[in-house]
Amino acid sequence: MGLFDRFGERASSSAAPAAPSAPEPGSVEAIAAGNVTLLQFLRRESGQIPNRAYILARTIAQHLDDVVADPSAHLLDVGSRITLERMATTHLPDTINAYLAARTMPDADELLVEQLATLEVAASKAAA
């Protein structure tokens, strides 16, 4: 056994096991993982947003669940899957966070509901 073999062996035997990797972006698994995080976020912020907005956000999450549960979800084009993933991980949380930062502004509640209604239409079309 050469000098480099011993060091390589020692290094590999003491290395920690690899952490499970995150789902591949745009995969059905990534949509599911994003939706889990979204639901946790919604539970945490539920008392801070108007009831109508909360209902719309939960409806969007349900549409995402419907997509994930559909066995043909893997057949969606990658662009659609990435859009759905981003809806759960970015679009919806960012919309709610923007509302939370500006909720004292006039018409903030109505604007939030309007934005979430637009996202809900897109999510319902994807789930159909």
Located regions from the model:
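Cytosol-/stroma-facing membrane-proximal "stalk/adaptor" domains immediately downstream
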Residues: 78-128
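Membrane-proximal, non-transmembrane interface segments of integral membrane proteins
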Residues: 14-75, 86
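Polybasic, Ser/Thr-rich amphipathic helices
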Residues: 1-12
